[in-house]
């Protein structure tokens, strides 16, 4: 059965492991992304070089913005990028196509870059500047933007990395010479340039592999949640007595007045923290400094997160598919109607999970999976062999439904996978499938609930 890069291109997965690359799925995006801090924190010369290339481009953007060169044409040329979907990472609802970086991001970033990177190249508190700082200011730049921007700036490195492996390990019949757009930046021409590569090629597109040791899950090492959560400790560590006193004084003023012995809510504290950071952006530099001083922690946490994704979506899914092949006719159901196929497959899933130890693959370190998003990805990865089109979470105007299974426009069944632990399970059962069936123009709907006793 073909699910992963190694399956589709006929190589041993151990070859990827030896090379240091993640064995991506070519069925659905997996929830990982590049953390630029891992380049900075690495001792590898090639990673240090890529970190410096990112800083060089940020310096270029800042200098142009300071000269007022941030009109619509330059924003389009220098800030707007398509998602590098060929790496098969991210949180795409269907397959591997995300939204990328549009004009809204470009305007937000270009108008604030001189504030975010005020000491770029002249750092006194921190060792270096970091792209992730843009996500710490309230300027409309989120972690998804940081991820897409990082991947585009590392595009040439990733393509070289993939080409080197492909030429050595993959049969030539699976390779193709591809002219890739916007690969490297020419500082003389001040434009992004294309470049040719020999790459793995399937379904009318090339594929990119990524080193595991620059990947993470959920959050970058430098992130706004840690900034807010560690606010008091960070500010306490500031050695400048006057600055530290001014910060805490301003923070107290930003908290709403309360009666004696009445505590502030977390929402009130978060709002006051954000106002204080806007007033004293120096706080961010001290936060980044602490992060820089814990490179080992960044590496260790990222490794654990990547290993978790590998366990859930590669090792466990592979074992689950083997169980389905051995214990059921899951992949042998004749295509009669979308409803029949969906129902039969769900019954097979139920039987293998409950009676053939399949449930064990939904546990990690003795704990059941807690995110429905993970359950949905697992479901799609096991369904790939169907003759029917299975689209994950289509949004037809009424909100997302987990799957719409169809054999042409006249034969559709909506399928929802839910965890019994979901606090909104009752509301979902009462309303959502009916609404989704109407939105998807079908009378067929199935809800499957995974319950851990």
Q: Where are the regions a protein language model picked out?
A:
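Catalytic core segments in nucleotide and nucleic-acid processing enzymes
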Residues: 1, 351-453
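Hydrophobic, Leu/Ile/Phe/Ala-enriched alpha-helical segments that form helix-helix packing faces
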Residues: 62-65, 154-169, 346-356, 379-387, ...
